[in-house]
């Protein structure tokens, strides 16, 4: 049995996807479309367009960088590193762009467990740029991977001090969770709950925090308030709460509601598949996964394909 909470942290680091300008309109058609696809999560299309831009010599540094980000998002970490290296070798790599590339390359190095290389990039960033919440988090995550717990803690504290948001607290918690150090991350969740909700999005975030803390009663209360405020994402989270409580019927109802309301119902189909797996209805799970795959972006696709493997393992039907 796999840990559903850990599956929610496939993407641990949130980094800027800022775009730089230049060149004439005709030359940048593929580049601009690639940037749009990258922002929208259409990573395979973005990769193809960036590769076309590279072959045409359009914005080489930015195009190599974009292709690297697409490869990173698609889970091709070694190839991502190669693209980032190529980007850094280009002429006229501005300071802001270099910071962006080094940050992404450090993430890729973490993914392939080349912690020394990741640390070297973090040190370069610290020496040449003003530290911000993202860089503190990245440095903390690298230190944690290298079992430098005190250094990790110090950097995470700096990250949260710079950006005391629900998302940052959840991100730090996720880093600890992925290292089986959940208790160390829980204090950030507790800190995030010290404020009050101002809108439906806040209620959704608070519900997510309570869910990670296994406080299902408060999670349910917050998420219902978010749903009353027309927050669609809260439907998926409430479905997960019901699943963990063993209430498959209500979980399915939430996931079905999400499928009917969301622009992209992939998360809802994935949730329905999880319910079917729990119920032992593997054929229905495969049907839901297939429906989800038809509408999924790259990140949802990873989860759907993972669950498809789980179903086939349970069916013993390879």
Set out the residue ranges of the language-model regions.
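Residue-level recognition of tetratricopeptide repeat
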Residues: 35, 69, 107, 141, ...
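Short coil turns that delineate tetratricopeptide repeat
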Residues: 58, 92, 96, 129-130, ...
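Canonical tetratricopeptide repeat
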Residues: 66, 73, 97-104, 138, ...
């Amino acid at each position: 049995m796999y840990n559903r909470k850990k599956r929610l942290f496939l993407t641990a680091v949130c980094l800027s996807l800022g775009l730089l300008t230049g060149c004439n309109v005709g030359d940048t058609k593929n580049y601009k479309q690639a940037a749009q696809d990258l922002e929208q999560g259409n990573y395979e299309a973005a990769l193809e367009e960036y590769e076309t831009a590279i072959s045409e010599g359009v914005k080489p540094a930015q195009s190599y960088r974009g292709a690297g980000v697409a490869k990173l998002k698609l889970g091709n970490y070694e190839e991502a590193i190669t693209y980032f290296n190529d980007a850094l070798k280009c002429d006229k790599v501005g300071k802001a762009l270099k910071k962006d590339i080094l940050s992404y390359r450090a993430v890729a190095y973490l993914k392939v467990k080349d912690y020394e290389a990741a640390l070297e990039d973090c040190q370069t960033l610290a020496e040449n740029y003003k530290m911000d919440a993202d860089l503190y988090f990245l440095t903390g995550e690298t230190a944690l991977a290298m079992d430098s717990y005190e250094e990790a803690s110090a950097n995470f504290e700096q990250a949260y001090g710079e950006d005391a948001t629900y998302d940052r607290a959840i991100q730090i918690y996720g880093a600890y969770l992925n290292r089986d150090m959940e208790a160390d991350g829980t204090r950030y969740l507790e800190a995030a709950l010290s404020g009050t909700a101002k809108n439906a999005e806040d209620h959704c975030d608070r519900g997510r925090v309570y869910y990670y803390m296994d406080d299902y009663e408060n999670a349910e209360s917050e998420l219902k308030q978010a749903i009353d405020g027309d927050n669609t994402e809260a439907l998926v989270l409430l479905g997960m709460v019901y699943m963990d409580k063993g209430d498959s019927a209500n979980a399915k109802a939430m996931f079905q509601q999400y499928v009917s309301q969301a622009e992209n119902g992939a998360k809802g189909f994935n949730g329905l598949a999880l319910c079917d797996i729990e119920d032992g209805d593997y054929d229905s799970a495969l049907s839901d996964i297939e429906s989800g795959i038809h509408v999924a972006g790259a990140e949802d696709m990873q989860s759907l394909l993972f669950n498809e493997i789980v179903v086939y393992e349970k069916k013993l039907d390879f």
